């Protein structure tokens, strides 16, 4: 559900 965040794992 991420991927769009630079600091959060995909």
From Swiss-Prot:
The keyword Secreted applies. It is found in: Secreted. Coiled coil: none annotated. One of its GO terms (biological process) is regulation of blood pressure. Expressed by the venom gland. One of its GO terms (cellular component) is extracellular region. Keywords: Hypotensive agent, Metalloenzyme inhibitor, Metalloprotease inhibitor, Protease inhibitor, Pyrrolidone carboxylic acid, Secreted, Toxin. The keyword Transferase does not apply. Transmembrane segments: none annotated. It comes from the Eukaryota. One of its GO terms (molecular function) is peptidase inhibitor activity. The modification Pyrrolidone carboxylic acid is found at residue 1. Disulfide bonds: none annotated. Belongs to the bradykinin-potentiating peptide family. This peptide both inhibits the activity of the angiotensin-converting enzyme (ACE) and enhances the action of bradykinin by inhibiting the peptidases that inactivate it. It acts as an indirect hypotensive agent. This is Bradykinin-potentiating peptide S5,1.
